[in-house]
Amino acid sequence: MILGNILKKNGLKQGIDMKLLAGDLPTGVASTFISPDGERTFGTYLGAAATMKAENLTLDMFKGYAYLYIEGYLVQDHELILRAMQLGKEAGLQICLDMASYNIVEGDLEFFDILITKYVDIVFANEEEAKAYTGKDAWGAINEIASKCSVVIVKLGAQGSCIKKGTECIKLEVPPVKKLVDTTGAGDYYAAGFLYGLTCGYSLEKCSIIGSILASNVIQVVGTTLSKKKWDEIKLNIEALLQA
């Protein structure tokens, strides 16, 4: 529980309403191995996370929110992810799915298709994950996925990102990066910035700009924690770009 308590304390400090379940096993851990070029590989111990069951979820947990963001890793428990999405829909939330990993997608392709077609409103994927799902390159993949959900975002690494909603298509370049140190958290920061933009009512282009700014900053540090000074700089940068 030590790591779990640290997570809870930090979340509450940031004003997050933490809905955590306690179990007998230790908190899960993901050890990150960073290569010289800044790419990363995870070694994971799921711990208590593996004991979470569909019956642990209640409708009250989903009330008062606008979006439910689910990592594709959760598809390993079909019953759990289905209940989460069903409760989210019942509570009136938009469902966001991050495909998580191309091998996860390849290993459960039919189930991913059911989720996206029936429940998911917004899909986040990188180029490899989108190709694993559709068998097509970036634009071919984005067109196919967009035919099954409301919004699809395909992240292209250093090449930026593609976003499509209906007939609206956007291609954005990535902000300049001084030095790539560690790609851990880049996708999560992008999604966080994008969803923040949506909750503020910004256009898809501005949502993507915010996500790209966050992602480009986190890859320049080891780990996923940015200093208060850096956050202040990021906020000013975002405000300037949004007003331009």
Task: List PLM regions with ranges.
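Short beta-strand scaffold segments in enzyme catalytic cores
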Residues: V29-F33, T41, G160-K164
